[in-house]
Every structure is written in C-alpha cells, then in structure tokens.
Amino acid sequence: MKTTVTTETITDVKMNIEPEETPTLDDKVTPKGKGKLDMVIAFDTTGSMAAYIDDVRHQVAEMIPRIFKDNEDLRLGIVAFGDYCDMENRDSFGNAYQCIPLTDNENDIIKFVEESKDTSGGDGDEFYELVLKKIIEESPWREDSSKAILLIADADPHEIGYTYRDYVVGNQIDWRIEAKKAADMKIKVDTVSICGRSWCKELSAMTNGISVPFKSSGKTGTMIETATTARSAMAFAESASGCEDASTRAYCRERVHGLKGKLFSMFSDCNDEELNDVCDSYTKEIDKADE
C-alpha cells in the first residue's frame, strides 16, 4: 500500500526534530586528573582584620559556586585563625584555629566561613608559623594535584623562643623551615600582605608563590576569587605541559585561556589600581605556566 506524504506531514516531522547543539566549554567533561587543584585559604581573624573578613563573609555564598564552576577538580580548605592568646588552654585551640579541611562541598565551605568566629590576637605578632606548619602537615593533599596556600596577613610571625603563659614555651617553630618544607612538597604559598610585611614577600619567594600588597578591606572577596581563578588556570597549564595526548593538551590550554578571559572580564572596566595590580600579578604567572 502506498503512503502519501502531505505537506502537513513534512511540517510535523520537521517540528519534532531537535537541532543539534554545538557543545560549549562548560558542557565538556574535564579529562580525568587534569586541572586538579588543592588550595587552602587562611585568613587572620584578629581585631585588625575584622573588616577584611566581614567582606568575605558577605560575598562567600555567591563567590564559592563561581569558583567551583571554574574547575571541576578543585578542593578548597579554609583556616580562620588568631594567636596563642585566643586558645582556650594549652591543650585546646578553641577559636584560635578554626579549620575545614580540603573539600569540594560548597555548602560546607559557605557555612564554615559565615559561622567562623573573630579573635582578639593580643600582642602584635600572630602565630603564622604554627598556621603554616599545621596546614602543610595536616592537609590531605592529593599526590598528583597542584597545591597552593593563600595566606591573608597583617602582622609578623613569632620568632624562635617566644613564650605565652604555658600555651607555648620557647617556641621552636621557624616559619622559614616551614616555607622550605612547603617548597619541597611543591606547595606554592601566595601571600596577601595588608601592611606590606617583608616576611610575606620572602615566604612567597621561597615557595614560588605570589605576594601582593593589599589595603582595601571592601575588596577582599574579589581578591580571593582572582587568586583561586588564577590558580585553577595554572593547574590546567601544568596539566597541559605534562600531557602527551594532543586532544587533552588542547582542552587544558582551552581552559587556561577561558579562565584568563574570566579575569579580563572581571577587570575590563576596573579603575581600581590595587585590584588591577593583583590581576596583573596573577596573569603574568599564568602566562609563565602556559609557555
């Protein structure tokens, strides 16, 4: 029996055919193990840093999803810290060291930051030396990941011999030794120096990290997003440089360029000299990693 196809039938068939969509970068699946980044953000919660941390708390709910969208194999850890004087006693840190270990659970990170407690800090110096030691030794770093720490600081670490009550007697932790330990583990320590501390520059130099001066408390969230976006770009650049598969290498380079594009769009209309300096510092490092 012959079937007659009418104009109406053809129209109906055309209407039921879905056009094929060209996959975008966001639709593509990241090749396994490429762009893998473990990054710990550590911020000083003492009184002088209150405005900086408040800015992060206000932005974190919107910022964290954007950061994780940039990299499907990202894990973040957060450390909020004070000083020895903020400990409950010699055996309990209390609010002096608050930590969420490396994780990809966005809700847990947001909740932790929003609920983190402020501290006093007491004297001028803070226990940055202990913070570095604990992050380096206790974080569950993945063996094949790019590793970074972002330390936001406005004071100096305690030197050898420092004593506070019986909480720490004759401090034996040297931040320089901790920096060498980080370098040996290929952990890059980026520092945001609120008061232009020279030790921050030295710490970053020792670990092949980036050190940027920063004064404006209302832009701390933007600075953190810039740093994490850039570190994701560098992780993809590292994956590309060590990859023999041409298609995977091309994908990683495409991700690098996409993340650089995000940074450019973030700062294309920015007239803030301080933020532009942060962006320029990180962009230069991305270019070096992508050579």
Language-model features: locations:
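Divalent cation-coordinating acidic motifs and surrounding scaffolds
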Residues: K2-E291
